[in-house]
């Protein structure tokens, strides 16, 4: 093991392969500073991290992140509040790989290009694999803000973004939004495979199932959407629309697993990535405590009011919970 001093004067441990080991909010800040000098730096998360009110994001417009970040099934909790474009834990990526990471928390912005994992993808071939977004994302811009449950925007000829085996549980409040990628522009390519979204979107005038596109190119394979209001039909994409009954009966988990030898998807209340079920059957959703019941109106994932005896995933006071 080695200790490396970053620009923030916090020493980050590295393993024998040179991966930076990220286990605290201070490590996150220090790694962001390292990326500003060495954009191809690789990292492994070693613990769940709550950033609190820390506004640090990795990658800048001038120096996008280009390395491999492995969350190792850990959770990153964010609370970003910004007044400028491009927001996500990874603000800009170009030729990066992000895998096995669960992001939850809050993103509030008065502008656009907000994503649960990534703000903007301007170049390179990029990979997001086995990740989960449970972020509450709100943009007050009022139009053309391009908010995505995973990525805000993807742009430029030759830019490729692959999203494989990912689960979107985001709650989005924005006028123009999509389950996975807010917008892809001008000959960029977005490919979404073996993925599921149970995201919700409020205040949307343009909400699409996978992504919006303007002269971009995209493919969608074996990807399922619970809430699909494709209101921007000339520039939208289609996944397979499913019902809560299908999510509950295990058939979609089987379809997502797709006869692979390695177990990637398992069945819980909804299909779940296996890596997030290893410890304490973690689903990324809190359970409602019967001893401390919530006081708001309770809805199912189709937006229909349900009683307090309803079992499964519910939305109450703008948050998703599990009632067992």
Language model: regions and residue ranges:
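Bacterial N-terminal signal peptides
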Residues: 1-6
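Predominantly extracellular beta-rich ligand-binding scaffolds that present long acidic/polar faces
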Residues: 10-281
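Short aromatic-centered micro-motifs
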Residues: 69, 298-299, 314
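Terminal processing/anchoring signals of secreted or surface-associated proteins
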Residues: 76, 101, 283-287, 303, ...
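Residue-level detector of functionally pivotal "anchor" positions at catalytic/ligand-binding pockets or at interdomain
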Residues: 279-302
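Extracellular Ig-like/FN3 beta-sandwich strand-entry sites
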Residues: 309-311
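C-terminal tail/sorting-segment detector
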Residues: 313-324
């Amino acid at each position: 093991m080695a200790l490396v001093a970053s620009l923030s004067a916090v020493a980050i441990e590295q393993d024998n392969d040179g991966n930076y080991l990220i286990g605290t909010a201070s490590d996150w800040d220090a790694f962001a500073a390292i990326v500003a000098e060495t954009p191809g730096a690789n990292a492994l998360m070693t613990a769940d991290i709550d950033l609190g009110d820390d506004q640090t994001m990795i990658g800048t417009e001038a120096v996008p992140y280009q390395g491999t970040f492995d969350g190792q099934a850990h959770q990153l909790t964010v609370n970003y509040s910004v007044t400028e474009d491009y927001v996500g834990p990874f603000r800009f990526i170009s030729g990066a790989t992000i895998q096995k990471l669960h992001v939850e928390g809050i993103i509030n912005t008065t502008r656009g290009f907000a994503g649960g994992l990534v703000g903007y993808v301007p170049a390179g071939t990029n990979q997001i694999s086995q990740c989960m977004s449970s972020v509450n994302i709100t943009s007050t811009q009022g139009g053309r803000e391009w908010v995505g449950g995973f990525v805000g925007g993807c742009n430029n000829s030759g830019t490729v973004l692959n999203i494989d085996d990912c689960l979107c549980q985001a709650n989005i409040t924005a006028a123009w939004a999509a389950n996975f990628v807010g917008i892809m522009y001008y000959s960029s390519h977005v490919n979404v495979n073996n993925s599921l979204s149970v995201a919700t979107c409020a205040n949307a005038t343009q909400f699409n199932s996978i992504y919006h596109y303007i002269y971009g190119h995209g493919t969608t394979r074996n990807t399922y959407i619970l809430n699909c209001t494709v209101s921007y039909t000339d520039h939208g994409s289609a996944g397979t629309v499913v019902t809560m009954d299908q999510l509950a009966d295990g058939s979609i988990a089987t379809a997502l697993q797709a006869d692979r030898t390695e177990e990637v998807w398992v069945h819980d209340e909804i299909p779940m990535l296996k890596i997030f079920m290893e410890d304490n059957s973690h689903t990324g959703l809190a359970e409602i405590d019967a001893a401390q019941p919530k006081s708001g109106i309770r809805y199912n994932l189709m937006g229909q009011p349900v009683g307090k005896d309803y079992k499964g995933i519910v939305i109450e006071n703008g948050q998703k919970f599990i009632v067992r």
